[in-house]
Amino acid sequence: VEGPLPCALSLGPVTAVANGAGEWRSWRAAAREALYGPRGFYRRPEGPAGHFRTSVHVSALFARAVARLLCRVDAALGRPARLDFVDMAAGRGELVTGVLAALPADVAARTRAYAVEIAARPEGLDHRIEWLPEPPRPVTGLLFANEWLDNVPVEVAQTDAA
C-alpha cells in the first residue's frame, strides 16, 4: 500500500484497516493484498528469500527429514499405489523440490507432489510438481504446512490469563 501507513480501528471482534486512500476493508483483505496483491511481498522478484531465510533455504537437511517422514507415512499407509505430498504455502517450491530429490526411487515413482500457493508458479520448477491455489482432495499421504500459518490473517485473537 502506498502513501501513509495504514491505521487500524477496533470494531469489536473485527478489525478494519484503512489504506492510504482512506478506503476501509477487512484485515483479511488488507493482509491478502499486502502478501499476494500485484506488488505484494510474495510476488516481488526477490521473494521472501530476499528478506529472510527459513530452514528450506539454509540446507537440504530439512527436506531430507521431511522425506524420511513421508516414507514413514508411506509405510503406515501400506505403501499405496499413489502417495501424495502436499506442501501448503509452498513459496517458490523449494521444500517440495528438496523432498522429491531426497526420496528413494521406489517411493518417488509413486509420489504425487503438490505445491499449494497463491503466488504464480516459478519458472523452471520441476514438472512433477503440480501447482495449485488450494489443496487437492482427497489426500493419501502427507499434507505438510510448515510455513502456512505464518500467512493466515487472524481477524479475531483471544488471550487468556495463561
Briefly describe each language-model feature range:
Residues F144-A162:
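A mobile, often basic/glycine-rich helix-loop segment
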Residues L5-E134, V139, A157:
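Rossmann-like AdoMet
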Residues V1-G3:
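Short, positively charged low-complexity motifs
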